[in-house]
Amino acid sequence: MRAAAISMPRLNKMPGMFFSASPKDSKEHSHSLLDDKKQKKRPKTFGMDVKTYLRSMIPHLESGMKSAKSKDILSAEEVMQWSQSLEKLLANQTGQNVFGRFLKSEFSEENIEFWLACEDYKKTETDLLHNKAENIYKAFVHSDAVKQINIDFHTRESTAKKIKTPTPTSFDEAQKVIYSLMEKDSYPRFLKSNIYLNLLNDLQANTLK
């Protein structure tokens, strides 16, 4: 505000000009000051907590887990293929979303979130492995993790040791356990669920139109 005061014309040299500015000029000046204040108030980012990390890593799950793509993109045949194997289901991003929605209804969405986190981790550049490994471990594997996955003590301890000197395969053992759990437990129920069957029926009905 001090800079604005200095730049104003002196009143004794310009009589009658103090209130002569047009409303438009006043508004533009006010907007400029507000913009400056907004820029100064922008928060600085010093790092990501676990929740922010998860959102950035698997945004299509954290954004509400849509039940399907628009019907002109997703076909009934594609959805039918999801019933062939869990592998085919998870190979499709919409399949991941729909399955994630089902797991959320069963309060076990941490399983697919961990599986996806592991898939993302394998593609990570070497210099970023340590930081990402710690985030995944804290989010899913640690005994106090907010989204703790259901793995045995041996696998948990083994994973903890591996991330001390992380490699792209550090979470493979734990990921296989969770995949097997989803394949034998959640996946068969998913194929019988209203979430899956209603989606398939809707798409088949649209195909006949």
Swiss-Prot record:
Topology class, membrane: Peripheral membrane protein
Q: Which GO terms of the cellular component aspect does the record hold?
A: cytoplasmic side of plasma membrane; cytosol; plasma membrane
- What tissue specificity is annotated for this entry? Detected in spleen, lymph node and intestine.
Extract one GO molecular function annotation from the record.
GTPase activator activity
Q: Does the keyword Transferase apply?
A: no
Q: What is its main location?
A: membrane
Keywords from the named record: Cell membrane, Cytoplasm, GTPase activation, Membrane, Signal transduction inhibitor
Q: List localization entries.
A: Cell membrane; Cytoplasm, Cytosol
For bias kind Basic and acidic residues, which ranges apply? 24-38
Mind telling me which SUPFAM superfamilies this protein's record contains? Regulator of G-protein signaling, RGS (SSF48097)
Region: Disordered; residue ranges are 19-42
InterPro entries the record matches: RGS, RGS_sf, RGS_subdomain_2
Pfam annotation, one family: RGS
GO biological-process terms attached to the record: G protein-coupled receptor signaling pathway; leukotriene signaling pathway; negative regulation of signal transduction; positive regulation of GTPase activity; response to bacterium; signal transduction
Give start and end of each RGS domain.
85-200
Assembly description: Interacts with GNAI1 and GNAQ.
The record describes the protein's role as: Regulates G protein-coupled receptor signaling cascades, including signaling downstream of the N-formylpeptide chemoattractant receptors and leukotriene receptors. Inhibits B cell chemotaxis toward CXCL12. Inhibits signal transduction by increasing the GTPase activity of G protein alpha subunits thereby driving them into their inactive GDP-bound form.
Write down what this protein is called. Regulator of G-protein signaling 1
Q: Which organism is it from?
A: Mus musculus (Mouse)
User: Which gene does this sequence derive from?
Assistant: Rgs1
